[in-house]
């Protein structure tokens, strides 16, 4: 089985390798640089749209069984702004989606992001950790290492696979 991930971020590619490797035998996972079609710092429904676009664009870069797109963004839920990571899995016909746990950023970080800056840049400045998003991620720093970005990404990938793991409960997805 060949899987294309719509990013070259090693954290996201490794998360897909980890989940698909537990679900299937003989899996090849490759990161592909593709566009998301949404702003670099997505808000609301832009986040899931970005994941879907990345999955479809990754799938189309070669001869793959699946394209996987992962996009993190901010979503307002009843006045609480949460960082939520979405995943989409595309097989050429059907797209399934899921998301991981959501969490809040410190007010100072959110204020900077609302002026147009990207969360990753603000968090790297705040922590002094260069390329934080390609390492433990903001979640790793904020949770004091109890959950890192790979684990958070794995959640969203597994959630997007649920309909594929249970085709009789959903519609038939092969």
UniProtKB/Swiss-Prot annotation:
GO terms for molecular function: ITPase activity; metal ion binding; nucleotide binding; ribonucleoside triphosphate phosphatase activity. It is an enzyme of class 3 (hydrolase). PANTHER family: NON-CANONICAL PURINE NTP PHOSPHATASE_PRRC1 DOMAIN-CONTAINING PROTEIN, PTHR34699. One of its GO terms (biological process) is nucleotide metabolic process. Keywords: Hydrolase, Magnesium, Manganese, Metal-binding, Nucleotide metabolism, Nucleotide-binding. It comes from Methanocella arvoryzae (strain DSM 22066 / NBRC 105507 / MRE50). Binds 1 divalent metal cation per subunit; can use either Mg(2+) or Mn(2+). This is Probable inosine/xanthosine triphosphatase. Gene3D superfamilies: 3.90.950.10. Mg(2+) binds at residue 63. Phosphatase that hydrolyzes non-canonical purine nucleotides such as XTP and ITP to their respective diphosphate derivatives. Probably excludes non-canonical purines from DNA/RNA precursor pool, thus preventing their incorporation into DNA/RNA and avoiding chromosomal lesions. Its EC number is 3.6.1.73. It comes from the Archaea. Transmembrane segments: none annotated. It catalyses: XTP + H2O = XDP + phosphate + H(+); ITP + H2O = IDP + phosphate + H(+). Pfam families: NTPase_I-T. Its cofactor is Mg(2+); Mn(2+).
């Amino acid at each position: 089985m060949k899987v294309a991930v719509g990013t070259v971020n090693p954290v996201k590619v490794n998360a897909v390798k980890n989940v698909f490797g537990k679900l299937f035998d003989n899996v090849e996972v490759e990161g592909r640089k593709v566009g998301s079609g949404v702003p670099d710092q997505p808000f609301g429904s832009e986040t899931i749209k970005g994941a879907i676009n990345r999955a479809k664009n990754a799938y189309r870069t070669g001869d793959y069984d699946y394209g996987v797109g992962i996009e993190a963004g901010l979503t307002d839920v009843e006045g609480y702004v949460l960082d939520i990571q979405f995943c989409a899995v595309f097989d050429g016909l059907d797209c399934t989606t899921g998301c991981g746990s959501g969490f809040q950023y410190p007010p100072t970080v959110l204020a900077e992001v609302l002026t147009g800056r990207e969360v990753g840049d603000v968090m790297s400045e705040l922590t002094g950790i260069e390329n934080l998003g390609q390492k433990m991620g903001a979640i790793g720093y904020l949770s004091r290492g109890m959950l890192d970005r790979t684990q958070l990404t794995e959640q969203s990938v597994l959630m997007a696979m649920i309909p594929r793991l249970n085709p009789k409960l959903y519609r038939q997805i092969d």
